[in-house]
Design a protein with these regions (language model features):
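N-terminal leader/targeting signatures
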Residues: 5-6
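Nucleotide-activated chemistry modules centered on ATP-dependent adenylation/adenylyltransferase
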Residues: 9-226
Length: 226
């Protein structure tokens, strides 16, 4: 009898086997829309202002953007609120070719804890992070559909510490589930991450040293102590 495979096995396998150039796919989407004179509506899930900086500078040339700040993984309420304020401040300071607005989702950390129950001791970048991606992208897709957006995407792919192959695989799957197009991305390409550091300095943004959840915070604190 063959052993039962974990539910996420296929996604992990596809992400590992198919090193897709998601930036190239995004370039193609942008080129096609530009040829047709179309400025689509995009819901952009934002994890924080520093990661958003380059994504907004880049995407606002081609999309009308609604930034969706939904991050129940941020365990400390004060941290959540400060990051939200920084996101709003950044948007108020930047200049955009097309309109950029922001809405914030419901803050309920218990939603995150419920999603990752049993995975508390997983290492960073493992199954717990996958559950977190799913939670945030699922709610983002539903919000995008409610608002009538053409696409939804996330700033998460800009981080060198995040698996863009996995995030895009999950995003595409969720997009198909709700009937909203997933905008493929790998924002760390074209030196996007380096550009985000430059923009963060320009706008004097708060740059946290952990992703947001209490588990990532403890991992960073442990590494510093060692």
């Amino acid at each position: 009898m063959l052993p039962l495979l974990p539910k996420n096995f296929l996604i992990i396998l596809l992400a590992a086997m198919n090193k897709i150039n998601y930036q190239k796919i995004l370039d193609g989407i942008i080129e096609e829309n530009s040829k047709n004179g179309v400025v689509p509506k995009l819901l952009l899930h934002a994890c924080c202002a520093p990661c958003s900086s380059y994504c907004l500078e880049y995407l606002s040339n081609f999309f009308e953007i609604t930034v969706f700040y939904f991050n129940p993984n941020i365990s400390i309420k004060e941290e959540y609120e400060y990051r939200l304020l920084e996101e709003k401040r950044l948007i108020s300071l930047m200049e955009f070719k097309n309109p950029v607005t922001i809405i914030d989702g419901e803050y309920n950390p218990n939603e995150f804890y419920s999603a990752v129950k049993g995975l508390e001791n997983e290492s960073e970048g493992g199954k717990r992070c996958e559950k977190c991606f799913r939670l945030r992208l699922d709610v983002s897709a539903k919000e995008a559909k409610k608002l009538g957006c053409d696409y939804f995407a996330t700033t998460l792919t800009i981080s060198p510490l995040k698996n863009s192959q996995l995030i895009n695989t999950i995003g595409e799957e969720i997009g198909q589930k709700y009937g909203v197009k997933w905008l493929f991305s790998d924002f760390k390409k074209k030196e996007g991450y380096k550009r985000s550091i430059i923009l963060s300095k320009k706008y004097e943004l708060y740059r946290q040293n952990y992703c947001g959840c209490i588990f990532s915070k403890k991992a960073v604190e442990k590494n510093i102590a060692e």
